Amino acid sequence: LTAVSGDGGETWNAVEQQEALPDPECQSHVLRTRWREKDVYLFSNPESETSRVRGTVKFSSDGTDTWTSKRLLEPGEFGYSCMTQLPDGQIGILYEGSDITQYFAKFPVEWVLGASPE
């Protein structure tokens, strides 16, 4: 489910189901970041409609209209997640794994695209 605000969160449009972003009603995260001199978006969540499993990161370069690439970060349990861009340009992600344990991983944006960093 998504809703969009164009005024800094004062008002929101109607909530919509996003077929490209299956979710078992678990907090997900969208990160807007700079990559190759343009704004891109990364989305992290458990990619399942029924279980908190398959922690996946998806990539959009068109303002979240489409999600053109994705990579599986964690095949097992995956709950709440939060991403940030680190000082070295990589993406850091903190997520809930098995037994409510917190895990941290980092990766370059190219990893989500299935490519090696240049």
Kindly give the residue locations of the regions a language model identified.
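Asp-box/BNR beta-propeller blade signature and adjacent active/binding-site loops
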Residues: L1-E118
